[in-house]
Regions:
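A short beta-strand motif characteristic of beta-propeller blades
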Residues: 3-16, 45-53, 84-91, 128-135, ...
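Beta-strand-rich domains and repeat architectures in extracellular enzymes and scaffolds
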Residues: 8-40, 44, 51-62
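Repeated scaffold domains used in trafficking and secretory/extracellular systems
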Residues: 16-26, 55-66, 94-105, 138-146, ...
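Hydrophobic beta-strand positions that form the internal "hydrophobic ladder"
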Residues: 31, 68, 106-108, 151-154
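Residue-level marker for isolated small/hydroxyl-bearing positions within beta-strands
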Residues: 34, 71, 109-112, 156-157
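Structural motif
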Residues: 38-40, 76-80, 115-121, 162-174
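Structured, soluble extracytoplasmic/luminal domains of envelope-associated proteins
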Residues: 41-103, 198
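Extracytoplasmic/luminal low-complexity segments enriched in Pro/Gly and acidic/polar residues
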Residues: 161-201
Length: 201
């Protein structure tokens, strides 16, 4: 049988945080909110933990653990934010298409240089660790990608349009010892005709 509730008890209230046009997302056991003007983290009581301002048209925000990576779609600046709110600003000099970050703060960004795509890996302090160069003609458009918890493996979903049909190629790169002897660190790949993989985890 269905239960019917006729009253409630208010246990706790907090003031609204963020902006009216902000996007809200879970951030560990806290709250992350961002907009075109900046990004902030709040605890359960609504107390601001940290804040980073910027100016973006279409912010891309990814978080894992206490680490956050933020960039404007097709912009050239990447923000790497640690658990305490300390931020590193990275000038990529190329438009950013997508990005991901690991729980230890290692970030990977897909950068576009005309028809050439670079998958560039950054340390939490913004140093370039590694880079893979590919092309849209060879691999396709990087639709989504994800970095492994050990910061070594990266999976990429490439979108290809061939003969009026949409196909997806999944490529898996290894930046560790296993991938050192492979061309472009590519250790495996799979093609899926007529399939679309917009997300990777």
């Amino acid at each position: 049988a269905n239960q019917v509730y006729t009253k409630f008890e208010m246990i706790k209230t907090i003031d609204k945080v963020g902006t009216s046009d902000g996007v809200f997302r879970k951030y560990q056991d806290n709250l992350l909110t961002y907009s075109k003007d900046g990004i902030s983290a709040y605890d359960k009581d609504g107390k601001q933990l940290w804040n980073q301002t910027y100016e973006m048209q279409e912010p891309i925000v990814v978080s894992r653990g206490g680490h956050v990576a933020v960039a404007d779609y097709k912009g050239g600046v990447l923000y790497l934010i640690g658990p305490s709110g300390n931020a590193t600003t990275v000038e990529t000099n190329l438009p950013i298409l997508d990005l991901d970050v690991s729980s230890s703060g290692i970030a990977v960004a897909a950068l576009q240089d005309d028809a050439t795509i670079y998958l560039r890996m950054f340390s939490a302090t913004g140093d370039v660790i590694s880079e893979i160069k590919t092309s849209m003609q060879k691999s396709g458009y990087p639709l989504a990608f994800s970095i492994s918890p050990d910061n070594i493996k990266v999976g990429v979903s490439y979108l290809k349009a061939e003969g009026g049909k949409i196909n997806t190629s999944l490529a898996f790169y290894n930046f560790g010892d296993v991938g050192q002897n492979e061309t472009d660190n590519l250790v495996s790949g799979y093609d899926y005709a007529g399939e679309l993989f917009p997300l990777l985890f």
